[in-house]
């Protein structure tokens, strides 16, 4: 058989093949004997009880060790067995050989020569074994903690246990590249925990080591780490210098006499845009759109600029927003604060009778917002129309005219209730935003500002982060008319629309109804808007703006952070939506079928007016758009990222 031998192993005489180098001859078959079919057969007649009876006493092994220490020489196996046991034979030799293979420390077997370990080695090995016993005991205790699923104190764990805890944390975060050790896997089985992220998150929550609302995608990102002490110190330095004269301040147009207003959500603290109305000497109504100017303090390629570029945007979470710049700047000198002089970029627009742009311009300025309004306050003023708010009412009328103009250019206006989950005091709460007149006013003003800046970029061949959208083939007017207005019709349109794209050259934006568009009104929250302002500044000062290639390089860098922020924000909203449904798992809601997502799996999209949400749900066969359904929770587990909804007729 070449380098292998066929042998019969154990009392059961199981046939196996092993390399000859792994085999050691203990006793030769006596002359004239027939090879036995089992080790229990003659001439060996060995079994467990026989071997146990033949094994010398522990003190005999100890005495042999002392003698061999004095001799200082190794012995062949047969001589060593006779020294230990006082005799030799198949049974005692096999018993002693098996003892050598066990956990004993006194001797070592080197190619059939038995050596007594030196005393120093023996003491070291015994010390190591004692230490290992203690470590094993601590490890067993740690694995016992897992089975108990009770809160633990990580600082009391042994290093090996802490390493395993860190490994479990990594798995819970979705990073399961490093395999779980066998002992840990067995401990998880005892703890009734599958070796998968969701189950491990449940276990870690029980152990008090995992925030049930921690986002795996947020872990170890720039937002998770916050701003470094160096960046915070730089922010404090800029905060202290904000009131001092800066380059270009003398060239700013003073617009503080205009009655400007900012309109935002009640809890918004970083105000990056405002509105004003001016009646020119020619009697023309001029719209002013003021935009915060963080570039006055933040130099290109400075540490804060590089960090903002890395983030790409602010991060919007249910528990609160994480800003692109340190908070003391975004809510301080960057923000358009009411009653204070603020540096800004101001975009002015005069509309023609149809709502098109008749004249426009962009100017660095000083502005002083007269007051701040919430959307609710602004809606009330627009509805009540008090004479002292004539400017606000005129702005509303002008921007409604502009909105109708865009609609005539093919813009898709799809206003509807929008629900999202916010966290209040640790609880998931549903917040529904209604498309009121003030929200439409602000949105239209921001789109108008983006159109004006994009037009300026087009006329001067300026590289900007233009936003565009390819033309789409929409359902026919007859098909849309057959659908009820609102979410059902909107879903049919949205299905046809392409993704928004960013490029350094202008192109039409289909759903906005514009030939060119750029986002330019949130430089505190979007790095791309800050890039726009820097290009405008270079142009206004007669300097060369960034080339298309240089702009594209910056866009690519910031979009890494933007994509990450979008993914984190979506995961966050999905998680808190699951938490909300856990709190309302017995509820049911009227729903309207919108369209099929995966008909083969009976997965469709439904709209729940009461929640202001479009949700994926299991739907009955043959559902048609606008069909009324009732939505219920089938399964929800926020730690496992699971939500299954079922809609029934």
What are these regions (language model features)?
Residues 2-13, 20, 30-31, 173-221, ...:
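Short, charged N-terminal helix-start/capping segments
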Residues 3-5, 23-25, 46-105, 112-113, ...:
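Electropositive polyanion-binding surfaces
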Residues 97-98, 102-130, 214:
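Charged low-complexity interaction tracts in eukaryotic proteins
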Residues 35-58, 138-169:
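Basic, amphipathic alpha-helix used for nucleic-acid engagement in HTH/winged-helix/SANT-Myb modules
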Residues 151-253, 257:
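Low-complexity, highly charged intrinsically disordered N-terminal segments
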Residues 2-52, 109:
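Long, low-complexity, charged/polar intrinsically disordered regions in eukaryotic proteins
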Residues 122-146:
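Short, amphipathic alpha-helical interaction segments positioned at domain boundaries
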